[in-house]
């Protein structure tokens, strides 16, 4: 869980990017060639006047549209839909901006309504201005968003708001129609979407100076209740968050990891806490309490960034009065504050990165759902891939009004993120909805349940009053008093309990009546009894409580009352309770008579009204005090900006406390006056009330006596059954005694002896099992230790085997090279032999022919013929010598090939011996434990690097000395005690020495300057080893090795190069 700071919603809202001033950058951008689509920025030159206008606060201006934020270019007209304009025109021709008619062609052809999509720009923040960001997107009129660098790229929406637009203007366009539809029984959803630090939370919640969508919607709901005569409303709220795909109840901190369920009306959260609200202040207090438990965190863009999605749900039930009753209408108003999507620019790590991944996953699923809904095809829609889309399934599927508010930043650094938000809004605009009113079955209607209970309780009171005379004479009063005194002795014990039950009944009627909010314009005659004046109080509170800032419904539930009174002065609360108890015996009962309806508000009504006023003021003082604390905490960062707010809050709190003290004084005076001026009619009504209570209690006593008779009959039946069971038990005991007397005592002793012997056997077995358990535990411990050592030895043997395999591979390559070379030499030898054989007959033939020709023509000179013959013999001898030399070379190559074959066979035998050794080590035999870790790494590197053959003899003595030292060091007494492994170890160490000599030769000759990896001999070297700085390994081998193959220095770090 992330840390939850104690700062509330107001401190977080004021630190949002909307509160930053919009100063102009010091320099203006210059035009450049290219376009946005080709990847090069093409900012237009703009002046300070034509760019985003400066303001001291984001909500300081009064413009409602986005057109005032910058001057419009000729040819730019507003539009109402969303569509991406086509290709970029050629540079020589003027840019043909699309018109509003072109952008709404697609939307006008659809039959159903669509999601309402509005765009809200925020100004450049201080950080963006200092960083030199420019305006990349801007509002072109009231319906278009256009790209600064490519004016042909434009999107059309229902409304576009510039940086100077207030939240109230956004609410009037985006949220007010949804709220009105919810009051008429149509479900509604309003949610803000955008990247992090774009102003979503500020738009939805706002602050003290400028409230957001949620406070404005709550205020609008209660104002619509006041303006709707003839209907009764019941309002409930719930507040939840989705943090890391886990649903938490913000109104109940214990409600964690709640589950989503589904019924006929849609999806709902199981176990969510719902609170009945009766005023805007009451609802806002729940929001403030929930914000204290919401997950927030800091990133590069925002100090208090939302780390979870929140859904504030307002459930509205309404029905008409009396004969005009047409059923109960039920609707839900969802006000959603989504967490911002995050990119790599936030540079979050650890928990923040994990939170961001969950946020991006849920928003990606939301985008996928919107995209599939906008296509209009019957495809699978992945609502269940995220908790957010699962809860929004009913809203997104078209069963209510949906309003999407996309908050975007015009900064060029967030150009791509803003473009993605605009494309998401464009897809959402194409989703069709078909909203309809909801009707609720009476059995599931909470307001109807309260009404039925109230009517039943009122019928009971009417039955109690029936037959009583409204006015009585003094004689009748005295008779009644005497009768009461006579019956008081018998009913005293029962009367106290019945008084408590009666008080609970009256308080329930009062509380249920308060929960039903009625308009002040309702002209229907008031109902009788206590519910009439309570409803009158709940309706006319705005006129009576003139000093209270909350000008809506007055009544709060009991839990909220206790919480609000706890923040007031304890002495005042005690005095109020004492006065109410003192006057409650007279004035509370007197208010239920028939004269109350004619005479207006009684003393009890006045005291109740004063008490409720004190409660409301105490709650407002507590809320103002918490807001003042948050502002004081925030003033550390911005003391000048919050000083005025702190002064205003302190002034309001002092005024409310002074007004509360005046009300407490008035309440004390009215209580004393009510006690002193109790009239005779109040006494008569009290007597009639007590008489009715006595008759009621007598009736209940008769009922209980009847119940007692039934219980006595059941008790008698149970007594009969108990007697029968007791008789059975006695018979069984007698049979048991007879059986025990008949059995001899010797049998008992024999059984005892058997039991003792069995017990001894069990004890012996348990001891044996304990001993075996201890033995097995020790063996297990030894086996674990032996297994660890064997694992180390097996790992070392595997390393040796892998290095031997590499050596075999290299030798196979060398054998292949030698065979190829041998083949070439054989071919050359055959060619030379053919030439030699072909020249001798040719010469002889040519000489014979020539002789015959010469004999035929003239006589040859013998001396010349001898000289020619001698020369030919010399050439023949030279060719024979060359042929002999080639044969000698061929024999040498054959010898080398045979040696390589033998060497390969020897290595294969060594490898097989090592695998045999590994197998023996695994079976628990003695291992080669004398080779330490350093020798193993050295031997492994020696085997790996000793693959190239060279004839140089440099550094042989040094290598032999080092190898002999290592060999002496590795020999231990354990080896001498195990002669079975001595031949194998001798062969292995001889092989290591041979590999060492080869490695020394290769380092001394050409491998010292080679750029081939010294381990795999395949890849080029690409890593500089530290601290030895040798450039001798490729990247994979450098990561696998722990020591340098050249100098045996332990590798601390690597520098990977790409050559």
From Swiss-Prot:
CDD domains: KISc_CENP_E, mRING-HC-C3HC5_CGRF1-like
Stretches for region Disordered: 1-99, 526-570
SUPFAM superfamilies: P-loop containing nucleoside triphosphate hydrolases, RING/U-box
Biased composition (Low complexity): 1-35, 43-58, 70-87
Disulfide bonds: none
Key words, A-Z: ATP-binding, Chloroplast, Coiled coil, Metal-binding, Microtubule, Motor protein, Nucleotide-binding, Plastid, Transit peptide, Zinc, Zinc-finger
Cellular component terms per the entry's GO annotation: chloroplast; cytoplasm; kinesin complex; microtubule
Residue ranges with Pro residues bias: 88-97
Record's keyword annotation contains Transmembrane helix: no
A single GO BP: microtubule-based movement
Binding site for ATP: 194-201
Highest taxon above the source species: Eukaryota
Protein name: Kinesin-like protein KIN-7K, chloroplastic
